[in-house]
C-alpha cells in the first residue's frame, strides 16, 4: 500500500502545476482601434502568466496563456477595421491556451495585465502598434533655444481638447438613459474643435477622436508634442443621488484639494488609467521633474485665471456647482508648462442634466461657452508666450506670418504690473466691469476671499481681459 501511495505522489509531482490548478477562464474579448494601434482586451476570471511572440510570412502575433481556457468563442469579434484579419484559438494538452492573431500589416506588439478595477476583473491587454508608423516617426530631437536678443513671432494659439475617458473606460453612466460619459465628452470635444478651428488666431488639437483610451500621461505628452498652449479636459460629473447639478472647473493643486468632495473627484478621475488600461511601467517616470518645473513657473496660476474665465462663461448657460475654480491633484492636468483645466460640464447622474447632455444643441452651447472663456483669456496667454521668449526687442530678419487676431492681441500691453487703487465706494464688481474682467479673476489675482475692499488697497489687474 505504501508503494502505491508513493507512486501516486511521484506521479502527481510530474504533472504540470497549470494542469492541477483550476483553469483561468477567458470569458470575453474586446477590440478598440486607435489611430496608431489596435488594442485587444481579454477578460479573465483570475491572474495568469502569458507569453507574446511574433511570426512572419504571413505576419502573426501569438499569445500563450498558461492554465487558461476559452469560455466563449471568437466568432462575434469584429476585426474588420483593425490591423487583425482573423483570430484563431487552440487549447494545448499542457493546459496552455494559444491565441493566434493573423495580421494585415507588420506590427509591434506589447502586452500588460490589469488588476480588477471598476466594473472589470483581471484583464490581459495586447496593444498592436503599426510598424510602418513607428519606423516613420523619427525620434524627437531637442529644439534649439532661440538665439539671444531674438523676437519669436507667434503663430496661432494651439488649444489641446481632451475628451475624457474612452475605450475600456466608459466614465460615469447616466441613470435614466444609460448615457456613457465617454460618448458625451467626445461629442462636446468635437463641437469645440470645430468652433476653435473657425476662430482666427486659434488652432485645435484633439487628444482623442474616437472610442479608444489614451493614458493620462499620454494625453499630456500629445498636447506638449503639438505645442499646445491651452489644455482643456472635458468631463461629465457623477455622484450618488440625483440632485447634484451644475458645471465646475478645476485646476491642479500640489498641496491638497479644495474640499473633500473635490479630492474624491480627483481620485476617481485619476483611476481612469486603471480602468481604461495604461501600462503602469510608463506612468510617472518624470513626476518629480514635472512638479519641480511647475513650481518654477506660473503654470498653476495661469490655469486658475484661465479656469475663472471659462467658469464665468459657463454661468451663461446654466447653474454652477462651484462658483470658484476648484483645485486637486488631477493627473491629467500635470503639464509643466501648459495652462490646463478640467471642465465638469454637468452631472450625468442627474436625469435632467443627463437628458441635456444627450442633446446636440446643448453640447454645442457648452462648447461655445468654453470657447468664449478661451477667447477672453487669449490676450493674456499671448502675453505669457511673449514673457517666456522675449529677451530683447530686435527684429528678426524674416519674421513668421502672424494672424490678424494675434497681431491685435500682441499689440496689447504685455506687462501684468498694472494696479488699481481702490477709491471710496468702489466694489469688486464695479472694478471688474471697469477693466472688462470677471470678478472671480480679480479675486484670484489678488487673494481676495470676501467682498470687503479697503480704501487705498492696490489691486493687480491683468494686462488685458477684453473679449476678442
Regions found by a protein language model. Name each.
Residues 14-17:
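N-terminal signal peptide c-region/cleavage motif recognized by signal peptidases
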Residues 1-9:
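Bacterial N-terminal signal peptides that target proteins for export
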Residues 133, 377-413:
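Intrinsically disordered, low-complexity mixed-charge segments
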Residues 20-159, 421, 430-433, 461, ...:
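Signal-peptide-cleaved, periplasmic/extracellular N-terminal interaction regions immediately downstream
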Residues 52, 63, 126, 240, ...:
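Active-site-adjacent mobile loop/cap segments within catalytic or ligand-binding domains
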Residues 135-285, 296-300, 304-308, 364, ...:
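Catalytic-core regions of hydrolytic enzymes
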Residues 418-421, 430-433, 437-468:
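Extracellular LysM carbohydrate-binding repeats and other cell-envelope/extracellular binding modules
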Amino acid at each position: 500500500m505504501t508503494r502505491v501511495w508513493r507512486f501516486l505522489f511521484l506521479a502527481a509531482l510530474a504533472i504540470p502545476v497549470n494542469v492541477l490548478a483550476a483553469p483561468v477562464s477567458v470569458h470575453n474579448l474586446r477590440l478598440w482601434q486607435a489611430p496608431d494601434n489596435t488594442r485587444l482586451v481579454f477578460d479573465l476570471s483570475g491572474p495568469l502568466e502569458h507569453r507574446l511572440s511574433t511570426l512572419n510570412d504571413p505576419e502573426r502575433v501569438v499569445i500563450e496563456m498558461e492554465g487558461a481556457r476559452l469560455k466563449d468563442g471568437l466568432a462575434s469579434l469584429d476585426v474588420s477595421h483593425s490591423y487583425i484579419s482573423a483570430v484563431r484559438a487552440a487549447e494545448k494538452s499542457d493546459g496552455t491556451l494559444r491565441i493566434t492573431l493573423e495580421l494585415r500589416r507588420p506590427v509591434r506588439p506589447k502586452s500588460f495585465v490589469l488588476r480588477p478595477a471598476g466594473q472589470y476583473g483581471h484583464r490581459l491587454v495586447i496593444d498592436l502598434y503599426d510598424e510602418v508608423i513607428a519606423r516613420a516617426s523619427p525620434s524627437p530631437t531637442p529644439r534649439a533655444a532661440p538665439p539671444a536678443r531674438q523676437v519669436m513671432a507667434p503663430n496661432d494659439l494651439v488649444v489641446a481638447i481632451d475628451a475624457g475617458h474612452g475605450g475600456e473606460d466608459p466614465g460615469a453612466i447616466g441613470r435614466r438613459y444609460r448615457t456613457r460619459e465617454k460618448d458625451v465628452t467626445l461629442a462636446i470635444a468635437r463641437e469645440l474643435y470645430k468652433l476653435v478651428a473657425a476662430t482666427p488666431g486659434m488652432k485645435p488639437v484633439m487628444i482623442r477622436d474616437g472610442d479608444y483610451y489614451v493614458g493620462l500621461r499620454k494625453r499630456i505628452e500629445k498636447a506638449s508634442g503639438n505645442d499646445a498652449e491651452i489644455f482643456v479636459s472635458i468631463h461629465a460629473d457623477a455622484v450618488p443621488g440625483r440632485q447634484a447639478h451644475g458645471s465646475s472647473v478645476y485646476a491642479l493643486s500640489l498641496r491638497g484639494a479644495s474640499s473633500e468632495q473635490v479630492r474624491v473627484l480627483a481620485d476617481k478621475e485619476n483611476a481612469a488609467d486603471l480602468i481604461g488600461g495604461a501600462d503602469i511601467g510608463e506612468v510617472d517616470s518624470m513626476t518629480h521633474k514635472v512638479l519641480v518645473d511647475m513650481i518654477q513657473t506660473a503654470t498653476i496660476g495661469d490655469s486658475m485665471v484661465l479656469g475663472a474665465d471659462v467658469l464665468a462663461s459657463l454661468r451663461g448657460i446654466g447653474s454652477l456647482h462651484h462658483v470658484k475654480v476648484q483645485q486637486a491633484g488631477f493627473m491629467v492636468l500635470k503639464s509643466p508648462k501648459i495652462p490646463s483645466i478640467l471642465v465638469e460640464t454637468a452631472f450625468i447622474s442627474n436625469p435632467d442634466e443627463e437628458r441635456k447632455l444627450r442633446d446636440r444643441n446643448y453640447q454645442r452651447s457648452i462648447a461655445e461657452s468654453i470657447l468664449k472663456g478661451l477667447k477672453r483669456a487669449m490676450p493674456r496667454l499671448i502675453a505669457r508666450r511673449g514673457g517666456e521668449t522675449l529677451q530683447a526687442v530686435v527684429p528678426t530678419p524674416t519674421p513668421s506670418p502672424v494672424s490678424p487676431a494675434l497681431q491685435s492681441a500682441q499689440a496689447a500691453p504685455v506687462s501684468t504690473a498694472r494696479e488699481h487703487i481702490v477709491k471710496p465706494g468702489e466694489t469688486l464688481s464695479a472694478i471688474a466691469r471697469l477693466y472688462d474682467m470677471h470678478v472671480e479673476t480679480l479675486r484670484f489675482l489678488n487673494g481676495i476671499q470676501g467682498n470687503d475692499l479697503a480704501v487705498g488697497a492696490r489691486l493687480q489687474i491683468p494686462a488685458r481681459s477684453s473679449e476678442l
